[in-house]
Every structure is written in structure tokens, then in C-alpha cells.
Amino acid sequence: MDSGTEEYELNGGLPPGTPGSPDASPARWGWRHGPINVNHYASKKSAAESMLDIALLMANASQLKAVVEQGPSFAFYVPLVVLISISLVLQIGVGVLLIFLVKYDLNNPAKHAKLDFLNNLATGLVFIIVVVNIFITAFGVQKPLMDMAPQQ
């Protein structure tokens, strides 16, 4: 090993000319060497969360349809309808909350406390949605057996 007098800073920049330093390697697609636009990053993150929220919303709507098709004779009819309804309402609330989070300017320090609260609220609501959906899965939603029986 070379025991030269060069100093390297942990997680710091590489000296010019060193392989991997910004001036030695060309910029790759998707990589930038400037600061990150925080508003753009937050908007992308909220858009991704919204898409996942929509997917879960569609899955819960499908589960609600299956439970309603089975009717009140299904053993867990009432608990599942209540849990799925709670999940749907919370998901709509989180979706609206994410829209508000995207609209705020993250560069304004006066709004940081409010944004932090709203972000923590959204995270807490998502956690509650996950727990509710675990219970929905535990009770089980099956398609009606009438659809599987041959018609004569």
C-alpha cells in the first residue's frame, strides 16, 4: 500500500483526477452533481405514495364487493365491511393529505413545522391502514361459492 501524505476525508470529495471523481468520469444518466431540488423530490415521493394508495384503494373496493356479494350470511360480514370501510376512508384522507403536502413550498422555513406535522400524520395514518388491512386479510375475503357451481 502507498503510505503517501495524501489525506482523504471520510465521505468527502475525491481529489481531482482520481478515478470516480466528478471531473474524471462523465456524468451518467440519472446522476447529477448539483444539489437536489427538495420540492421536486417531495413531489415525486408523494406521487409514488399516491399511486400505491390508489392500488390499495382498488384492492379494498374489490374486497368490499366480494364481501357484499356473499351477503350477511357470511360469518365475518359485519367486521369485514366495517374494517374495509375504515380502510377506504383513511386511504382517501391520506390521499387528500398528500395533495396538500405536494402543494406546500419546502424551501419556506416558516412552514417546516406544519409540513413536519402533516408528514408525521400521513405516516401514522398509513401505519393504521396497514394494521387494518392485516386484520382484513386475517378475516379473509373469499369469492362467493355460487359462482363456482355449474349452472343447470
Swiss-Prot record:
Transmembrane region(s): 79-103, 114-138
GO cellular component, one term: extracellular region
Result, substituting K45Q: Strongly reduced ability to homooligomerize and mediate plasma membrane rupture (cytolysis)
Family matches, as Pfam families: Ninjurin (PF04923)
Outcome reported for the amino acid change (mutating I134F): Strongly reduced ability to homooligomerize and mediate plasma membrane rupture (cytolysis)
Effect of I86F: Reduced ability to mediate plasma membrane rupture
Topology feature Cytoplasmic, residues: 104-113
Phosphoserine modification, residue list: S21, S25
Protein name: Ninjurin-1
UniProt lineage: Eukaryota, Metazoa, Chordata, Craniata, Vertebrata
